[in-house]
Amino acid sequence: MTETTSKTAPWTVEKRTAILVLADGTVIEGKGLGAIGAIEAEVVFNTALTGYEEILTDPSYAGQIVTFTFPHIGNVGTNAEDVEDLTPANRHGAVGAIFKADITSPSNFRATEDLDAWLKNRGVIALAGIDTRALTSLIRERGAQNAVIAHDPSGKFDLEALKARAAAWSGLENLDLAKDVTVGQSLTWKETPWTLADGYGEQDTPEYHVVALDFGVKRNILRLLTGLGAKVTVLPATATAEDVLAHNPDGVFLSNGPGDPAATGAYAVPTIKKLVETDLPVFGICLGHQMLALALGGRTEKMHQGHHGANHPVKDYTTGKVEIVSMNHGFAVDSDSLPENVEETHVSLFDGTNCGLRVVGKPVFSVQHHPEASPGPQDSHYLFRRFINLIREKKGETPLPEREQAA
């Protein structure tokens, strides 16, 4: 790849209305879409072929610009049902998006709005018409990039000022974003998973009570819990262990979320440590997995480029099976730092990084990937049943089959 620290990159379009300025001075020009403005963020790439709306509304992408490696994004439009952030009015999720091709008119029976208008309404700045393969290769070689994405229909940009902003931004390390995306107060979640015939349902006869600590939770996680018979009480990220226990839960869920897990060390990690000391079943996903590892005495580290996509192979040591899963994280647990009473349960077959753990002798476990998918494969849905079975075991009930039986 040609070095382009002082001039416009070679994969750009002639008439620019948006630009991406990397911290090293590289400038990528294209067509602007979505919101007008400029913002600093980390540039990553996602390899999923579908589910762009779920990806862009995943709160785990707060502080990031998503480069879609699949060239055609926006074909099926958008709708209110596929939004993943818990409070859409707050527009938590990715702040920028990068596409290979221009957005076309949507064609789908569920579409209510085209992607460009939807991006505008959510305040997401987008750039189209660039060589996303070249940008993805750059990220793979140099790592996730700090950058500024800017959109102005006039095409007029102060490049030197934008370069200075990109170079000055400190990035996601030591940045606590969980407090920014969490709910403001507790709420009860009843919505169950979507079906083609009925859409979303509602859980009116719950058998269990799960408290979910919201560090940036996705809706589909909560739906899968309610779909298995749970009443879910969602608490803010800053809730204490005493706050959680006051709800008398049967189990505790630690959600996904954005930012550096170590930056939550002043509030979330101590809370999780106290919860682990109880006999309550605890299940964590993504950021929740990382914070659980910290609470157990482990360490986390910033990854070179992170894992973002719906086609990642993971091995489950507890079953010996390989699953294809969805991932979205830029930090990872250092498996060598885990204490002796913590067992590694899952590992990435791409790079060998830790993807799961459990505490020996306690009903506590977590995974780095996203078993709820949305978007992605459903290979790991069984983990929600594994969590519910820990609750059922404490109640003296017969466990559910971890995998649904064929009809």
UniProtKB/Swiss-Prot annotation:
Which residue range or ranges hold the Glutamine amidotransferase type-1 domain?
209-397
What positions constitute the catalytic site?
286 (nucleophile), 370, 372
Residue ranges of the region described as CPSase: 1-205
The reactions it catalyses are: hydrogencarbonate + L-glutamine + 2 ATP + H2O = carbamoyl phosphate + L-glutamate + 2 ADP + phosphate + 2 H(+)
**Example of a GO MF term:** glutaminase activity
Q: Which UniProt keywords apply?
A: Amino-acid biosynthesis, Arginine biosynthesis, ATP-binding, Glutamine amidotransferase, Ligase, Nucleotide-binding, Pyrimidine biosynthesis
Kindly tell me the pathway this chain contributes to: Amino-acid biosynthesis; L-arginine biosynthesis; carbamoyl phosphate from bicarbonate: step 1/1; Pyrimidine metabolism; UMP biosynthesis via de novo pathway; (S)-dihydroorotate from bicarbonate: step 1/3
User: Which SUPFAM superfamilies would you find in this protein's record?
Assistant: Carbamoyl phosphate synthetase, small subunit N-terminal domain, Class I glutamine amidotransferase-like
**Gene Ontology biological-process annotations:** 'de novo' pyrimidine nucleobase biosynthetic process; 'de novo' UMP biosynthetic process; glutamine metabolic process; L-arginine biosynthetic process
Cystine links in this protein are none
Alphabetized InterPro entries for the sequence: Anth_synth/Amidotransfase, CarbamoylP_synth_ssu, CarbamoylP_synth_ssu_N, CarbP_synth_ssu_N_sf, Class_I_gatase-like, CPSase_GATase1, GATASE
Q: Which residues bind L-glutamine?
A: 60, 257, 259, 287, 290, 328, 330-331
User: What PROSITE patterns would the database entry show?
Assistant: GATASE_TYPE_1
Indicate whether Isomerase appears among the record's keywords.
Answer: no
EC number(s) on file = 6.3.5.5
Q: How does it assemble?
A: Composed of two chains; the small (or glutamine) chain promotes the hydrolysis of glutamine to ammonia, which is used by the large (or ammonia) chain to synthesize carbamoyl phosphate. Tetramer of heterodimers (alpha,beta)4.
What this protein is reported to do is described as:
Small subunit of the glutamine-dependent carbamoyl phosphate synthetase (CPSase). CPSase catalyzes the formation of carbamoyl phosphate from the ammonia moiety of glutamine, carbonate, and phosphate donated by ATP, constituting the first step of 2 biosynthetic pathways, one leading to arginine and/or urea and the other to pyrimidine nucleotides. The small subunit (glutamine amidotransferase) binds and cleaves glutamine to supply the large subunit with the substrate ammonia.
Q: Its family?
A: Belongs to the CarA family.
Q: What name does this protein carry? A: Carbamoyl phosphate synthase small chain
